[in-house]
Amino acid sequence: MLKKLAWYWSFVELIKGFIITLRYAFKPKVTLKYPMEKGPLSPRFRGEHALRRYSNGEERCIACKLCEVICPAQAIVIEAEEREDGSRRTTRYDIDMTKCIYCGLCQEACPVDAIVEGPNFEFATETREELMYNKEKLLRNGEIWEEAIALRLKKDVSYH
């Protein structure tokens, strides 16, 4: 009797599994064939960091160091000096991407939208040294992604 009950239960469970399989076989697929297909990104997606420039080519960063102070991972290091006109500009702006937790606090703290997290999430490297971003690398990212970053910032709603 117990053997017959176990066989019956196994058969019923097998049929249930087939029914579930058939149900999902004819539904639209939810997976993407990455990297050929890419899904949509939220305007607030936080990817690779970039430093932006004004349209006249001047760096936006005013060396207020708010991003360095607010970074919970202490991944940002900034050194600055005063210029002849009295304004401050960075001489060193480094981000250790191995420490960064992509929280976006640096972007939120920046009063001039100088540091942003762009739409690029495909930046795999072979060595840890390549994940140490200096000012030149960050400015280059800003130049490459400026159009996409500006569009995303326009779509985004301010918290303030």
Curated annotation (Swiss-Prot):
Residues 52-81, 91-120 form the 4Fe-4S ferredoxin-type domain. It is found in: Cell membrane. Binds 2 [4Fe-4S] clusters per subunit. Signal peptide: none annotated. [4Fe-4S] cluster 1 binds at C61, C64, C67, C110. SUPFAM superfamilies: 4Fe-4S ferredoxins. Its main location: membrane. Its cofactor is [4Fe-4S] cluster. One of its GO terms (biological process) is aerobic respiration. Keywords: 4Fe-4S, Cell membrane, Iron, Iron-sulfur, Membrane, Metal-binding, NAD, Quinone, Repeat, Translocase, Ubiquinone. Its EC number is 7.1.1.-. It catalyses: a quinone + NADH + 5 H(+)(in) = a quinol + NAD(+) + 4 H(+)(out). [4Fe-4S] cluster 2 binds at C71, C100, C103, C106. It is a peripheral membrane protein. It comes from the Bacteria. One of its GO terms (molecular function) is NADH:ubiquinone reductase (non-electrogenic) activity. PROSITE patterns: 4FE4S_FER_1 (PS00198), 4FE4S_FER_2 (PS51379). Gene3D superfamilies: 3.30.70.3270. PANTHER family: NADH DEHYDROGENASE [UBIQUINONE] IRON-SULFUR PROTEIN 8, MITOCHONDRIAL, NADH DEHYDROGENASE UBIQUINONE IRON-SULFUR PROTEIN 8, MITOCHONDRIAL. NDH-1 is composed of 14 different subunits. Subunits NuoA, H, J, K, L, M, N constitute the membrane sector of the complex. This is NADH-quinone oxidoreductase subunit I. It comes from Wolbachia sp. subsp. Brugia malayi (strain TRS).
